[in-house]
Amino acid sequence: MRLIQPIFASYSTRDTGLGEDNKIFNAWKEVNERVKKDMDLGVKEFLLFYIPEYKLGEKADTHRGNEGIDSHKFDQVCVTAASLARDIQPQCRLIVDVCLCSYTQDGHCCIVGDQEKTDKLLAMSARDIYTASGATVAPSDCQDNTVKNIRATKGGGIDIMSYSTKFRSTFYRGWRNAMKIAKGIHRPYQLDVHDREGAINRSIKYSNDGANELMVKPGITSLDLIKPIKEATGKPCGAYQTSGEWLGIGAPGSLEETYHIFKRAGADYMITYGARRLARHHRQ
């Protein structure tokens, strides 16, 4: 089972609440250094989250809202993320998260009420990141058309890791704090935890749309879905150990225990904030 380490990057360094190892790094000064250290430990894959300096359309003296979001400004942010991806891509496998939630002021993964604009921005983001860096793109937005549109835009060359079975969950709280995303939002496009059949079918849909790899999230509450998803699609499926899961790990040996549980469930990869810690442990 492969280990994937999330990396947070922005214009400045600050704490995430997810531990010193998972702080937000300065995109231009510290990310390369952190990646090199992790690779020395044995980590070979990284999931990049890019946090813009400002929400799109946001100004210090204006009310919050998404009225100011436009394709040109969004494209500039995506190019910045792609430039960072290009700098570290030759050293490792880099996966770049694709979503709108860190850019929109209301914290939604879409432009509410404007599906056409949502589809355009997400496809443009993936296109620019891939064109500039060759990185794998990981759409996490849970919109119906994203994977299909990315595949149509860039054809067979682009590698897509889809957050294909992603539930509405309380286990995301630490990540949303780190990304400065508004709390208390109901996201109907994310799956209901009660809906097993719908969860499996969502991964089948994204597989048919052209995703290369699939995912369940949160990890520990979705492990029962990995085997049926893999059997239905014939594609790799991994699990994301979310920030809430990570923050709940405290006892000695508990991280290693969850690693073996994910592996036992058949996960092809595990995204975890403790990837570097696990890699260090395995080397010892």
Identify the meaning behind each predicted range.
Residues 2-4, 10-284:
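Alpha/beta enzyme core
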